């Protein structure tokens, strides 16, 4: 069986093995990743199919794709666009170096392909939970601000509040659920989606959300206020007053209007984070130039900056990059950047 072939996969799984059919499309039973994940407990062959598809994707898109992108100087040169995304994030294309996998260990291995030139190393620094820090600041939520500024683990702290127990009794599963709620709130997640993400009932998911919003009451008020403000002004804006106009808020179609409300909630958060990293890039570049260091900013991946520098200057460069990132702007919440040094991108990150 060719695991990439949809037809052959259907025949093998649903006819030959007699596995339950979870989802049907116009062309037949679906064998997409979501369906296969739901069938993992039915037969061990599912794991093999998923792994094969993952390896095939990594091989074709990243291994072979990146090899084709290497230019005559032995380097890969991408193009950056400042105005491609509506949130204000910088995007990368031809090739897109911002979508190198990071969620899985196998995917992260792809970063080993990217190495510094002889005698140099890579300095990599990224913001820690910048969108949640921005949310805490915009919402002026005292509990969340205090948690961040005290150096607490925000997901453990949230879990302790949501599950009403001391932090030392918070389990990994509780922290994982709290993490999903923390990040989900930024994107306007509902009980249905949260329940699906963390594997609980819709009722439990709603209880988590309600408990979260009771704990962080400032966030709750902010989420309502920011939509009302956007509806009144006709646009949503970042901390630095960059606007995104939202005609969707006046739509008669309920789904379009709901989408506009989600944008009104998360644009100030995502947009402010995007503004901050751009400010940090300017400050880092200027500082490296002012101090006449043999160092060059070579890549930005959303909340992450990568600098190529001489090994001799690497510790100084790491100090500069993290310092400028953390002081990119003044907020009620301290910004935090974590960094490392390595010969390749995998090691540096």
Indicate residue ranges for each PLM-predicted region.
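C-terminal polymerase-core module
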Residues: 1-47, 214-262, 266-268, 308, ...
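Catalytic palm active-site di-aspartate
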Residues: 127, 191, 208, 296-310, ...
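Short Gly/Ser/Thr- and Asp/Glu-enriched loop/turn motifs at secondary-structure junctions
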Residues: 4-8, 176, 298-302
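Function-dense linear segments that define catalytic or interfacial modules
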Residues: 82-167
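Conserved catalytic core of nucleic-acid polymerases
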Residues: 63, 77-78, 82-85, 160-293, ...
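Catalytic palm subdomain of template-directed nucleic-acid polymerases
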Residues: 192-203, 305-320
